[in-house]
Amino acid sequence: MKTYHLNNDIIVTQEQLDHWNEQLIKLETPQEIIAWSIVTFPHLFQTTAFGLTGLVTIDMLSKLSEKYYMPELLFIDTLHHFPQTLTLKNEIEKKYYQPKNQTIHVYKPDGCESEADFASKYGDFLWEKDDDKYDYLAKVEPAHRAYKELHISAVFTGRRKSQGSARSQLSIIEIDELNGILKINPLINWTFEQVKQYIDANNVPYNELLDLGYRSIGDYHSTQPVKEGEDERAGRWKGKAKTECGIHEASRFAQFLKQDA
């Protein structure tokens, strides 16, 4: 039987994983998936870059925290985010985490505190010269380091099937063997319209770039507004074949991680 070794010496079998997904698909709301996950998995965090789905999850977690604990939040600061994203991060921290005496865990590229530091260390416009290396240094390595240092075994993500490409085949719970974590996708079956409706109905702060035609927001150099009728992630890496930044495709970077081990 296939077994997976997670952080904190937790062992999960493929049979368990399949059973969880079979049972969770029967639940009617994301809140039920979230509540079940909180009571089931130790060392549970949320990871987000403050996209709409992640913001919905934060608000749901906050409301559920009256009964359950509030999982801590991990943010990977690539040092290339839009200023609006960083402003939103501060707003979210003040609204949701400071009242619970929590701070958002921020991880940056190793040895860098600013975009200038990153360019000085790795060269200007690395994303144009070696896209995989950039993704590894700015996103994959900081996330891997965070999972280990914070002893994370499971994370909530904001991925949904309606985002298309590889995400259309998502399961509610997935294994990330390289990082030793489970990834839980509580809003897996929601559409963009459902997500935005929740944001508006619950007065959840969101990135002001959404009002300028952006839908999926990543680094400033690889994010564009989308046109009417386009896939919501069509503005990411426009003109390139890639659809993921690397954080959710860690196995692609196994060789880099081995070199750094």
From Swiss-Prot:
InterPro entries reported in the protein's UniProt record: PAPS/APS_Rdtase, PAPS_reduct_dom, PAPS_reductase_CysH, Rossmann-like_a/b/a_fold
Record GO cellular component, one term: cytoplasm
Swiss-Prot/TrEMBL GO biological process terms: cysteine biosynthetic process; glutathione biosynthetic process; hydrogen sulfide biosynthetic process; methionine biosynthetic process; sulfate assimilation, phosphoadenylyl sulfate reduction by phosphoadenylyl-sulfate reductase (thioredoxin)
One Gene Ontology MF term: 3'-phosphoadenylylselenate reductase activity
Top-level taxon of origin: Eukaryota
Keyword Membrane attributed: no
Main enzyme class: oxidoreductase
Documented EC number(s): 1.8.4.8
Pathway(s) where this gene product acts: Sulfur metabolism; hydrogen sulfide biosynthesis; sulfite from sulfate: step 3/3
Role noted for this protein: The NADP dependent reduction of PAPS into sulfite involves thioredoxin which probably plays the role of a thiol carrier.
Family: Belongs to the PAPS reductase family. CysH subfamily.
NCBIfam families given in the database record: cysH, PAPS_reductase, PRK02090.1
Name listed for the protein in its UniProt record: Phosphoadenosine phosphosulfate reductase
Source organism: Saccharomyces cerevisiae (strain ATCC 204508 / S288c) (Baker's yeast)
Gene that encodes the chain: MET16
